[in-house]
Amino acid sequence: MVQRWVDQPGDVLDDTEVPDEEPDAGPDLVDLLPAGHVPPGFLPVLQAYDYAGDEVTLVHADDARLRRMAVFDVLINNADRKGGHILAGVDGGVYGVDHGVSLHTEDKLRTVLWGWAGKPVDDDTLRDVAGLRDALLGDFDQTLRPHVTNREIDALYARTVGLLENPVMPSPDRRRPIPWPAF
């Protein structure tokens, strides 16, 4: 068996290497913060109590990369976008971990990225949504068919059309707005 450890920022492999700079201190892209302490550049999602009984606020960064992920989640009807499924890469990218709890024909959107609820979708993102709609009318649906059902493709198409006709981020379902646990 061969195993390779993936070096992390700040790791030092031997005495000759200089450690990487420490990452900036501050909240993660999605985080729990003490109630009333939402820093600039972050959007509150909900108020809750932590395991110690203290009030906390679930927040996420007001970041264009996360906003695009939130739109993607709306389109694919992601039922499981947890905070731990959003990774900040050392390359500056933001990556979503998805495992197939999406593309359902019934509305099942559950995400921690509700900070933009009720806000308009930006024009650049709408152009991409229109591109997806057009691709689904072309050959892209044939690429998807071996992997998802016709009904799921039809639902995806309907969500693209719906977002283009009403380019506003949806509001959460009051019954089950976020996946649990949130991280």
Description of each model-found segment:
Residues M1-F183:
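Phosphate/dinucleotide-binding and metal-coordinating scaffold of catalytic cores
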